[in-house]
Amino acid sequence: MAINVIINGINGKMGRVVKENITAQSDLELVSGTGRQDDLAKTIQTTHADVVIDFTTPQSVFHNAEIIIQSGARPVIGTTGLTLEQIALLDKQCRNKKLGAIVAPNFSVGAVLMMKYAKEAAHYFPDVEIIEMHHSQKIDAPSGTAIKTAQMIGEMRSSKKDEPFKDRARGEIKNGIPIHSIRLPGLFSHQSVIFGSNGETLTIRHDGMDRNCTMPGIFMACRKVMELDYLVYGLENLL
């Protein structure tokens, strides 16, 4: 039986690409798409949606996720902006409803592997900085992927305070790790995690050329979320 899917934010750039690609997935049925003016809860109920893919805005994503869960569907969220406290609240709601949810800063399998390998490298290299580069239309900075990478590396290190540099050109500190953000036309999605030690450096880099690089991860999440009864944060926890 096919999984009934709604795309919330279907008129956005990511929503349109998901719509174009989902028709090739025989086990995923696109039953509706919603935007700002639509009643999301009513749409979930009338279409009997199993999964709602959310690519909306940082300002609305938490409210959207609560609506999805309370309406009995499973959120697959690629929108950035959720805090760890909000993710914990959503997880509690999922467990109460016995519904799965997936929140992923990046659905690209290559980007997720970059984060995973960076976490492993942090065992051996205590000094690290992150450079993330995106197209000029990207709203948030640092990117959700860079913040998640810093969190994962931070798990492997003794805690460091996020004290800002006196020189702001040195970047923003997350989990004790400097992050440098670049926004330019001609770029899409690129991140380098650069480790340094005596006499050597190690760079782990991922380059996403267009939004299609996230499609396998998104569709995998739509299938995996049906097996869960709690929230999973990060696609790396599904690989």
Swiss-Prot record:
<keyword id="KW-0457">Lysine biosynthesis</keyword>
<dbReference type="InterPro" id="IPR023940">
    <property type="entry name" value="DHDPR_bac"/>
</dbReference>
<feature type="binding site">
    <location>
        <begin position="78"/>
        <end position="80"/>
    </location>
    <ligand>
        <name>NAD(+)</name>
    </ligand>
</feature>
<protein>
    <recommendedName>
        <fullName>4-hydroxy-tetrahydrodipicolinate reductase</fullName>
        <ecNumber>1.17.1.8</ecNumber>
    </recommendedName>
</protein>
<comment type="similarity">
    <text>Belongs to the DapB family.</text>
</comment>
<dbReference type="GO" id="GO:0019877">
    <property type="term" value="P:diaminopimelate biosynthetic process"/>
</dbReference>
<dbReference type="GO" id="GO:0050661">
    <property type="term" value="F:NADP binding"/>
</dbReference>
<feature type="active site" description="Proton donor">
    <location>
        <position position="138"/>
    </location>
</feature>
<keyword id="KW-0521">NADP</keyword>
<feature type="binding site">
    <location>
        <position position="135"/>
    </location>
    <ligand>
        <name>(S)-2,3,4,5-tetrahydrodipicolinate</name>
    </ligand>
</feature>
<dbReference type="InterPro" id="IPR000846">
    <property type="entry name" value="DapB_N"/>
</dbReference>
<comment type="pathway">
    <text>Amino-acid biosynthesis; L-lysine biosynthesis via DAP pathway; (S)-tetrahydrodipicolinate from L-aspartate: step 4/4.</text>
</comment>
<dbReference type="Pfam" id="PF01113">
    <property type="entry name" value="DapB_N"/>
</dbReference>
<keyword id="KW-0520">NAD</keyword>
<dbReference type="InterPro" id="IPR022663">
    <property type="entry name" value="DapB_C"/>
</dbReference>
<dbReference type="GO" id="GO:0016726">
    <property type="term" value="F:oxidoreductase activity, acting on CH or CH2 groups, NAD or NADP as acceptor"/>
</dbReference>
<feature type="binding site">
    <location>
        <begin position="104"/>
        <end position="107"/>
    </location>
    <ligand>
        <name>NAD(+)</name>
    </ligand>
</feature>
<dbReference type="GO" id="GO:0005829">
    <property type="term" value="C:cytosol"/>
</dbReference>
<keyword id="KW-0220">Diaminopimelate biosynthesis</keyword>
<feature type="binding site">
    <location>
        <begin position="9"/>
        <end position="14"/>
    </location>
    <ligand>
        <name>NAD(+)</name>
    </ligand>
</feature>
<feature type="active site" description="Proton donor/acceptor">
    <location>
        <position position="134"/>
    </location>
</feature>
<dbReference type="GO" id="GO:0051287">
    <property type="term" value="F:NAD binding"/>
</dbReference>
<dbReference type="InterPro" id="IPR022664">
    <property type="entry name" value="DapB_N_CS"/>
</dbReference>
<keyword id="KW-0028">Amino-acid biosynthesis</keyword>
<comment type="function">
    <text>Catalyzes the conversion of 4-hydroxy-tetrahydrodipicolinate (HTPA) to tetrahydrodipicolinate.</text>
</comment>
<dbReference type="InterPro" id="IPR036291">
    <property type="entry name" value="NAD(P)-bd_dom_sf"/>
</dbReference>
<dbReference type="GO" id="GO:0008839">
    <property type="term" value="F:4-hydroxy-tetrahydrodipicolinate reductase"/>
</dbReference>
<dbReference type="Pfam" id="PF05173">
    <property type="entry name" value="DapB_C"/>
</dbReference>
<feature type="binding site">
    <location>
        <begin position="144"/>
        <end position="145"/>
    </location>
    <ligand>
        <name>(S)-2,3,4,5-tetrahydrodipicolinate</name>
    </ligand>
</feature>
<keyword id="KW-0560">Oxidoreductase</keyword>
<dbReference type="GO" id="GO:0009089">
    <property type="term" value="P:lysine biosynthetic process via diaminopimelate"/>
</dbReference>
<keyword id="KW-0963">Cytoplasm</keyword>
